[in-house]
Structure formats: C-alpha cells, structure tokens
Amino acid sequence: MPQPIDALAGFLEQNRDGGLHPILWIGAGASAAAGYPTLAGIEVFLRQKLPGSREAGFALVADFVAELGESELAAVLGGVAEPRPFAPIHTAVARLAGAGVCPVLFTTNYDRTIENAFAEVGVAFGAQCLEDDFVLQGGNQVQIIRLHCDPGDWRSAVRAVVSLRAFEASYPRLVHHLDRNLRTRPVIFVGCSMRDPRLLDWLASLPVSDRRDLHASRAILTREEWLRLAPPNRDLLASANVKPILLPDHESVTGLMVELAGRAG
C-alpha cells in the first residue's frame, strides 16, 4: 500500500494528465488547526449548560438559544480561546492553489483564515458565496467558493449563521451547486468529517449509475474519523468513487498538505 503522500500525489498526477484540476473542499478541521472550535467542539460547551438536550449539531445550537437565549450563547462562545489568524495547513493550501494544483476551493467555514493565508503567500484570488449564482471559470485566478457569506468575527457568525434555520435555508442551494459542479470535477476533501448531510443526501439522491460515473475523489481524514462514519455512509461514499486517505491524527493531515505543497514548488 502506498504512503499517503504518494497516494495523493499519484491521484493529482493522474488528474493532471487527464486535464483535470480537482476541487479542494476545505472543512472545519482546517479552521480547528488555527484554534477555531468545530461544531462538535462547540457542542461540548453547550451541553455543559444544557445537559438535557438530545439534539446535536445545528439543532443543538437552536435548542440552546430557544432555552437560554442568544446572550447566553454569546457568553459561552466568549469563553473559548481566541484563534490564530491562520495555520500551516492554510499556508499549504495557498501554495497548492498558487501552483495551479487546485485552483478552485469550496469551504463551509465561517472565518477568514483561507483569505488571510492567500494574502500572506501572495496568491491572487476571487471569492464568491453561495448566495450568488456562479459558474466555475477558467483562467489563472484562484476561486474561493463559500457556503456562508460575510465571514469575519467567528463568534458573530456562529450566533447568526449556525442555526437550524440557516442550515435548512442553505440546503437546497448547496445541493444545486453540488449537482452542477461535482458531476464534472474530482474533489479532494480536507478537514472534513464526511458527515455533512447535504453532501451525503446529494450523493444518495443520485442513481447508482450516476454515482458510478462521478470522477474519483479523495477524502483526507484520520482513521478515527473514518471509523466514526456509519457503515452505510462509508458504502455510499465508496459507491461514488470517494476513497479515503487515512492518517493517524490531525497533525499528520497538516503534515501531508505541507509536504504536498513542498513538492508542488
């Protein structure tokens, strides 16, 4: 079995030879590397104040606000450590994008770590959000496609956007763009738990023959995260040609991306 770096480099080389540049999908794990709490991390703090709730994720945040109010949510978030501007994984992503390896990025994060890293490295980019209709363009400029508009102060974003209502409102729009773009390009998932129901539901909605025809994609995640996925979801990803590249921990994920960026020049 090839080493993770060789498996990923080989995947990129195969696509480059075929004239394809994968979409780089950056999830919450990348922001966590810069000190931002993941939704799962926020849940831990919320459950300390609301131990009786059986909800999780977006529904738990909405439940917390309904029971204790937005001011209490703000107080809980205020106790979380202040994050850093960006982390080595963001610098690696910027270098990869600047080298033309992955000129299109999708992100579901609420912060500006990606943009900050691109500015520091000196990579020109254009940013669009899902509220805008967009078509992936050719050319030299990197495109950053955001699920959530107006990123900035993460605490304000969590209070305003991480809610069941906002999640449901964004659902059909994201599915539309998944169907429009992921049918035509391979994807590399980084910092993603692969449990986002919008992605899984979109894949499940496709006929088996359509899933089989999707470009091969790769998910870079820890073994623990992969095993945490329900077996039916692992089977669903496999049916859509999504294969995992497994690493022992999150530090190794960062190391993989840094090494890949070094190879890209």
Where are these regions (language model features)?
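Short, glycine/acidic-enriched capping/hinge loops at junctions between secondary-structure elements
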Residues: A34-A40
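SIR2/sirtuin-family catalytic core signature
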Residues: M1-L24, A30-A34, F45-K49, R54, ...
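Short glycine/proline- and acidic residue-enriched helix-loop micro-motifs
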Residues: E72-V80
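Active-site glycine-rich loop that binds ribose-phosphate moieties when present
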Residues: A160-H176
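Conserved subregion of the PPM/PP2C metallophosphatase catalytic domain
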Residues: I114-A119
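Active-site-proximal beta-strand elements of phosphoester/diester hydrolases
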Residues: I144-C149
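Active-site glycine-centered loops adjacent to acidic/histidine catalytic or metal-binding residues
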Residues: G27, N109
